[in-house]
Amino acid sequence: MRKRIILVTTLLCILGCAHDNRGPAARLESTPRHDEWVTIDSEGRTLNAYVVYPQSSRKAGAVLVIHENRGLTDWVRTVADRLAERGYIAIAPDLLSGAAPNGGRTSDFPSSDAAREAISKLPREQVMTDLANAAKYVRTLPSANGKLAVAGFCWGGGRTFDFANAGDDISASFVFYGTGPHDDAGASGIDGPVYGFYGGADERVNATIDTTRAAMEKNGKHYDPEIYPGAGHAFMRLAEEPDPSEANRKAHDEAWSRWLTLLHAID
């Protein structure tokens, strides 16, 4: 059994850790998988979401990908595409839908700073409603098997904790350098295990890990944080930019390997 686990982990790393030097837009343009933009009715709002399907002969589990505070960028869409490459239906909702100038979405903001400012003003209830409707959409697709995992990056990591706490029968949650709950109210309703991925040089976020661990343990929840030495905040994205630091690149590869292994275990 141990040899089998090691073999699966090694294979998944080979599949998930290969570096593509092309930019996100070029990678998306050449994907062989079916991807599409969809609009979802979210309590009277129009929620835009990016969906990618695996090339598979069986029903697949789904992963809800929650973007950073920059909004639904091309990089986040490449994460969804990579998950589909590994056999999952991935949905990445644009939580800035309707918030850009003229009611646009992330791509309609003049700068990433403008997107960050808009994200800071999003009502929490609206974000949770949008996530719930995106989850409902992907779960009820004919090619979905009903299982759902959630993953979020930075701001999206914090929202991953929030959404898991809303209790929506989530198989597992994956938090990439996002802050977590500090009390019973933020942890008591969490569904499924939560796995954390943190850069060792990201003390602003890491200083909250012990408090989150205590809140999770008090409420009988599974929380497994992993810290990658020397890596900074947003290492998953920064490792794919030109000339990444060795620490970020190593953390990126190890985190992808761990993530895919954990997803494989619940599929």
Model region roles, listed by residue range:
Residues 24, 28-31, 37-140, 237-240:
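Serine-hydrolase catalytic machinery in alpha/beta-hydrolase-like enzymes
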Residues 217-267:
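C-terminal catalytic histidine-bearing segment of alpha/beta-hydrolase fold enzymes
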